[in-house]
Amino acid sequence: MPQTDKQVCIPPELPELLKQFTKAAIRTQPPDLIQWAAEYFGAMSRGEIPPVRERSEQVPLSNWAELTPELLKVLHSRVGGRLIIHADELAQMWKVLNLPTDLFNSVMNVGRFTEEIEWLKFLALACSSLGVTIAKTLKIVCEVLSCDHDGGPPRIPFSTFQFLYTYIAEVDGEISSSHVTRMLNYIEQEVIGPDGLIKVNDFTQNPRVRLE
């Protein structure tokens, strides 16, 4: 193979382009990520609007069940508290609930999951297909994970919230790590009580908590 002295020049705007691509992929949930990526970047190169579905658009699901927080809660209970689950087993659980296969594949692609899946990360991305904003996505995750049966507001350990918020913000790509750290520090120091739990109201109705 002939050698070349040419250097590959990486444009400075590439990181931002990739962030926008990742966010668009999560919003659109394409069944074939590779084909959609080709169409996305092809449109960008031609100066056209890329094929990004808005949150308000409805996806035709034919005979599939519609993904809901209630079904995600059922799925979470079947995972049984495991942190890691095998892809084939999770796919079978998803199938038993009659959930859309294309959505499962899209979450797998966006999360870059392989055979061993970190369940909380998969759950966070699945919830992001229902939530318009990061705050609403985290609200749904809290509702799914909460084990309270006393009729109180959904709540989860702050450590779990910290993990989920950091991950979702990283995938979203538009929120600086410094902002995430600042919000988490404020919540931990000013909001969280002795029980170490965070309630949905703590980050949805507190004017000083702005997750985005």
Curated annotation (Swiss-Prot):
<feature type="modified residue" description="Phosphoserine">
    <location>
        <position position="56"/>
    </location>
</feature>
<dbReference type="GO" id="GO:0061512">
    <property type="term" value="P:protein localization to cilium"/>
</dbReference>
<dbReference type="GO" id="GO:0001932">
    <property type="term" value="P:regulation of protein phosphorylation"/>
</dbReference>
<dbReference type="GO" id="GO:0097228">
    <property type="term" value="C:sperm principal piece"/>
</dbReference>
<dbReference type="GO" id="GO:0030317">
    <property type="term" value="P:flagellated sperm motility"/>
</dbReference>
<dbReference type="GO" id="GO:0048240">
    <property type="term" value="P:sperm capacitation"/>
</dbReference>
<feature type="region of interest" description="Interaction with RHPN1">
    <location>
        <begin position="209"/>
        <end position="212"/>
    </location>
</feature>
<comment type="function">
    <text>Important for male fertility. With ROPN1L, involved in fibrous sheath integrity and sperm motility, plays a role in PKA-dependent signaling processes required for spermatozoa capacitation.</text>
</comment>
<dbReference type="GO" id="GO:0042802">
    <property type="term" value="F:identical protein binding"/>
</dbReference>
<dbReference type="GO" id="GO:0044782">
    <property type="term" value="P:cilium organization"/>
</dbReference>
<keyword id="KW-0282">Flagellum</keyword>
<comment type="subunit">
    <text>Homodimer. Interacts with AKAP3. May interact with SPA17. Interacts with RHPN1. Interacts with FSCB; the interaction increases upon spermatozoa capacitation conditions. Interacts with CFAP61.</text>
</comment>
<dbReference type="InterPro" id="IPR047844">
    <property type="entry name" value="ROP_DD"/>
</dbReference>
<comment type="similarity">
    <text>Belongs to the ropporin family.</text>
</comment>
<dbReference type="GO" id="GO:0097598">
    <property type="term" value="C:sperm cytoplasmic droplet"/>
</dbReference>
<dbReference type="GO" id="GO:0005737">
    <property type="term" value="C:cytoplasm"/>
</dbReference>
<feature type="domain" description="RIIa">
    <location>
        <begin position="12"/>
        <end position="43"/>
    </location>
</feature>
<keyword id="KW-0832">Ubl conjugation</keyword>
<dbReference type="GO" id="GO:0031514">
    <property type="term" value="C:motile cilium"/>
</dbReference>
<keyword id="KW-0969">Cilium</keyword>
<protein>
    <recommendedName>
        <fullName>Ropporin-1</fullName>
    </recommendedName>
</protein>
<keyword id="KW-0597">Phosphoprotein</keyword>
<keyword id="KW-0966">Cell projection</keyword>
